[in-house]
């Protein structure tokens, strides 16, 4: 791949880790049949030829397989992680060694993070991306916020907020001083973004409602083969992996409090119960609360659960669901972690500023806070994604579902001219993604007869369910 002289080649922790990363990528490919089938299907066609793709998504081994799929399909790709702790350094090195510009390492500062995001949006010679693969919406946010600043530079004078906002505005200010029309030019060339996660999708819909969205978006998260698999089954395995790698704690016999019972919360609650924990769920939604109760979980408020829990897991995508006051009341040695996209589900900044607690780093991504009354808690991954900060995220097979959707979305956006809106992939593609993964796990599908298909009013080859079906 040719790298523009004006664009940085890569920045990773240690390029010498590339060989190790390549060995793990080879293993992951065998567990990612969807992506490998896409490569085979489009071999020689190069449906993404000419596309400049900026990726802001956890730089893991599984993501490496996605990146190489996009490259195989003809795309010019630049990549950064969407979380300061989620990069697997050997994966980043392996991809950088192939010539794909990667800007990611585990343990970035917030300033590093937004610098890396800036790099993936610069393809050299004044060019930005045509397409974005986003996870959490930060790459999209940088373009849209930069665009707004160019329309109203006074926004730079009012930049404050938390540390993350200050880091973002620092980059945007530097870009504005270099080129006061940069983001207008980038937005003009954009064909669209495909968004991976619930939080990012919420951002897209909010931008659309406010009239701020500048280019089309495909909501990959709400594809059934993403949300009902990655969010549910992926979290069911990777949550426990993160907690155990971080703490070596015995989960059996503990009380686990899972805040939120959406798809992610469901996976987490079932994970903790499968290890022998007694699980308490908190919810705002009466439907989700009823589901949790019907599964046998106790459902109550955080104010009541806070004094019982030994392990607290936030899954809501909302802010301030675990407050400083909650942490003051938790039992001694409680473990606090988050598996939602951002760190604001837990009040980490107020905790760090609180004079009545002493912080002690135990090891990377494990911090002990001792309060003035003598009790302590353990905060994992500084309140960021525990499964990626303290472990390696979801297994390859379930990520193949998600990333096959991402690849199809990128092709869809590149090949077609969508109006500015938020879209979902059609049901037929959702079913095709599932179909591509069946042989790997020995599944044999029953085939409808023509008469049976006519009787229930569906095509013999699908799709079999209406768009509103909830699986």
Swiss-Prot record:
Q: Which pathway or pathways does this protein act in? A: Amino-acid biosynthesis; L-homocysteine biosynthesis; L-homocysteine from S-adenosyl-L-homocysteine: step 1/1
Q: Which PROSITE patterns match?
A: ADOHCYASE_1, ADOHCYASE_2
Which keywords label this protein? Cytoplasm, Hydrolase, NAD, One-carbon metabolism
Class of enzymatic activity (EC top level): hydrolase
The residues the record assigns to binding NAD(+) are 197-199, 231, 260-265, 283, 318, 339-341, 387
SMART domains (UniProt xref): AdoHcyase, AdoHcyase_NAD
Entry binding sites for substrate: 60, 135, 196, 226, 230
- Subcellular localization: Cytoplasm
Matching entries from CDD domains are given as: SAHH (cd00401)
Enumerate the Pfam families for this protein. AdoHcyase (PF05221), AdoHcyase_NAD (PF00670)
Highest taxon in the source lineage: Bacteria
Gene Ontology CC entries for this record: cytosol
Q: Which family does it belong to?
A: Belongs to the adenosylhomocysteinase family.
Function field: May play a key role in the regulation of the intracellular concentration of adenosylhomocysteine.
**Under what name is this protein listed?**
Adenosylhomocysteinase
Provide the taxonomic classification: Bacteria, Pseudomonadati, Chlorobiota, Chlorobiia, Chlorobiales
